[in-house]
């Protein structure tokens, strides 16, 4: 846990809960990890398992199609094991129901047979910890959400945290990187470790081809230009989203369905991948009527702000 960079508050809360559960020799409370893709939810799930000294069983919401799929996993868990369900918000509601008694009472009811002769059998489970990961906690049903004792909202990472992650990853990748280059790479990574590591690998490719021993700031700048990533970390699709809101919908408001259709990507991609960072960075704002482009978005794209549009600010 101490080696995990970033998410300081979450690490403290988890560390306290894990230590207490180990003293009591009880299963850790169920944990829900919430945040945009690439912030380390899966990594945290594995760290929880490692800190508890138990096994982790990994699955995802979309592939759990029948109650029997969940029952098969639950009955194979040992005391204190961690069951990690990624994209838990995409789990079938009928499948979700079997988790209610499993999470609360460590029991499940299985229906044997069909028709009038069918009977229900209650099976006791070993105490376990369910760790769910979601990019959209609002899509979880209230009964499921309420059964999580620990709900952790992951934040975007700071430049300093990302640069440390990049420097550590560079050692693993057997490549040297200058401090300034790591900081620049961090600034273009949208506050997301997964993106930072992906960009580092692309810069490493150029370093390999050119036979350079160390990655410098000029190499990072060149790769960012090739990838179309600007100083704010926005790529072509980010800018297309902003430009569409401004030019097609006169700055907004616009609903996610209309915006997705205009840009040519799915609603989920807008909501889960692009919108969180654009909101966090102040390029868009969300109102009850839809998304609107902010003055920062106009300035970033070099588009003249309509007279009177932001006068109230």
Curated annotation (Swiss-Prot):
Species assigned in the record: Thermosipho melanesiensis (strain DSM 12029 / CIP 104789 / BI429)
UniProt key word rRNA-binding: no
GO molecular function annotation: ATP binding; ATP hydrolysis activity; four-way junction DNA binding; four-way junction helicase activity
Subunit structure: Homohexamer. Forms an RuvA(8)-RuvB(12)-Holliday junction (HJ) complex. HJ DNA is sandwiched between 2 RuvA tetramers; dsDNA enters through RuvA and exits via RuvB. An RuvB hexamer assembles on each DNA strand where it exits the tetramer. Each RuvB hexamer is contacted by two RuvA subunits (via domain III) on 2 adjacent RuvB subunits; this complex drives branch migration. In the full resolvosome a probable DNA-RuvA(4)-RuvB(12)-RuvC(2) complex forms which resolves the HJ.
Highest taxon in the source lineage: Bacteria
InterPro entries the record matches: AAA+_ATPase, AAA_lid_4, CbxX/CfxQ, DNA_helicase_Holl-junc_RuvB, P-loop_NTPase, RuvB-like_N, RuvB_C, WH-like_DNA-bd_sf
GO cellular component: cytoplasm; Holliday junction resolvase complex
Protein name per UniProt: Holliday junction branch migration complex subunit RuvB
Localization (cell): Cytoplasm
Small ATPAse domain (RuvB-S), as annotated region: 158-228
Amino-acid positions noted as binding ATP in the UniProt annotation, renumbered to this chain: 38, 41-43, 104-106, 147, 157, 194
Known function: The RuvA-RuvB-RuvC complex processes Holliday junction (HJ) DNA during genetic recombination and DNA repair, while the RuvA-RuvB complex plays an important role in the rescue of blocked DNA replication forks via replication fork reversal (RFR). RuvA specifically binds to HJ cruciform DNA, conferring on it an open structure. The RuvB hexamer acts as an ATP-dependent pump, pulling dsDNA into and through the RuvAB complex. RuvB forms 2 homohexamers on either side of HJ DNA bound by 1 or 2 RuvA tetramers; 4 subunits per hexamer contact DNA at a time.
Gene that specifies this protein: ruvB
Record-level GO BP terms: DNA recombination; DNA repair
Keyword presence, Signal: no
Keywords: ATP-binding, Cytoplasm, DNA damage, DNA recombination, DNA repair, DNA-binding, Hydrolase, Nucleotide-binding
Stretch list, region Head domain (RuvB-H): 231-313
Family according to the record: Belongs to the RuvB family.
Catalytic activity entry: ATP + H2O = ADP + phosphate + H(+)
Taxonomic lineage from the root: Bacteria, Thermotogati, Thermotogota, Thermotogae, Thermotogales
Residue ranges, annotated region (Large ATPase domain (RuvB-L)): 1-157
Record-listed DNA binding positions: 286, 291
Sites where the protein binds Mg(2+): 42
Written domain comment of the UniProt record: Has 3 domains, the large (RuvB-L) and small ATPase (RuvB-S) domains and the C-terminal head (RuvB-H) domain. The head domain binds DNA, while the ATPase domains jointly bind ATP, ADP or are empty depending on the state of the subunit in the translocation cycle. During a single DNA translocation step the structure of each domain remains the same, but their relative positions change.
Xref: Pfam families: AAA_lid_4, RuvB_C, RuvB_N
């Amino acid at each position: 846990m101490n080696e995990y960079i970033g998410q300081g508050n979450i690490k403290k809360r988890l560390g306290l809960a894990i230590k207490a559960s180990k003293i009591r020799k009880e299963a850790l409370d169920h944990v829900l990890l919430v945040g945009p893709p690439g912030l380390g939810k899966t990594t945290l799930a594995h760290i929880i398992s490692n800190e508890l000294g138990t096994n982790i069983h990994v699955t995802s919401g979309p592939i759990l199609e029948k109650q029997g799929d969940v029952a098969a996993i639950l009955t194979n868990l040992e005391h204190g094991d961690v069951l990690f369900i990624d994209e838990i918000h995409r789990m079938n509601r009928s499948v979700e129901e079997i988790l209610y008694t499993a999470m609360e009472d460590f029991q499940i009811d299985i229906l044997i047979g069909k028709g009038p002769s069918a009977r229900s059998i209650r099976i006791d489970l070993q105490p376990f910890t369910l760790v769910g990961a979601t990019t959209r906690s609002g899509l979880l049903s209230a009964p499921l959400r309420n059964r999580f004792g620990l709900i952790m909202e992951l934040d975007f990472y700071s430049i300093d945290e990302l640069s440390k992650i990049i420097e550590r990853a560079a050692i693993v990748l057997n490549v040297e990187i200058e401090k300034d280059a790591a900081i620049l790479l961090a600034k273009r990574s949208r506050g997301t470790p997964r993106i930072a590591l992906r960009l580092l690998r692309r810069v490493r490719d150029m370093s390999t081809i050119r036979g350079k021993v160390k990655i410098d700031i000029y190499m990072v700048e060149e790769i960012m230009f090739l990838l179309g990533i600007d100083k704010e970390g926005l790529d072509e699709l980010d800018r297309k989203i902003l430009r569409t809101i401004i030019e097609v919908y006169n700055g907004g408001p616009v609903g996610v369905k209309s915006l997705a259709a205009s840009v040519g990507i799915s609603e989920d991609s807008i909501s889960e991948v692009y919108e969180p960072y654009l909101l966090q960075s102040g390029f868009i704002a969300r109102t009850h009527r839809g998304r609107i482009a902010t003055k920062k978005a106009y300035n970033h794209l070099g588009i003249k702000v309509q007279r009177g549009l932001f006068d109230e600010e």
